[in-house]
């Protein structure tokens, strides 16, 4: 117990908070590069991969968030949570995709750009922990959407959701400014708390991050297991076909998002304490990228409402009109439009969420 308290006590001196108060210089006791000879390895292929995937995901994610923020979807507490999740996901994607790709491309280590890597690592680690808390909150929200008898449902109703969102917001701020950052090393194309790989020291262990990752794995599995049970029960007893279809979409979206988060959390905890071959470390880095990218991929592939609005946002009006004129017109189109409208109304009335 005393060991854990010691590791947590030196978080402040190893954190972004100290870095900013010390004239944007990391603590010399923990992050002194004087006399350190640690050369990186240029990773041009992986560097280009991470940067290209990051740009692609951001080009999809940002329009999705714009659509969500401007649409009636924001009437749902679920989408208010998703909007905040999207904002911190973008911060993480900048770090684990664009910055990771660039640093890997040039073969950088912590001592190559200590100030820049320290700052980026603080943002990346803090926003990752914040996204974990937000995902758990989202899972609880979805459970209460389906089972209205859960007492916690009241914290998502009306203006209460704004106070509830302060929980992941404060947790994100704490994680960014008051815990140890992750630091890049091109030898493994990943981020570690220890800036000097090969010089082992337990003073770089981030206890808060470890607890966070263990909790997100256990809580996510438990909550989504419960969600699966609720959906299975609803499918057997619900009279509305539209409700059944909506619940299935919720389950698919939740599982896809949860799986990447839990995988990244588990691998990162494991490789901080046990030997991991480079392939496993790289898998963890890709899983971290996928954990934040999966949300917008789910939006654009499974959520017809968001997909339709994104097309409307990105495709010029004259192109849409030209496509509408040249497309084949059949009598089934008004019927399908009516069905979509009815499905939307049914979904709002039953779960408060359009999927």
Where are these regions (language model features)?
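Seven-transmembrane-like multi-pass membrane architecture, highlighting hydrophobic TM helices
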Residues: 1-355
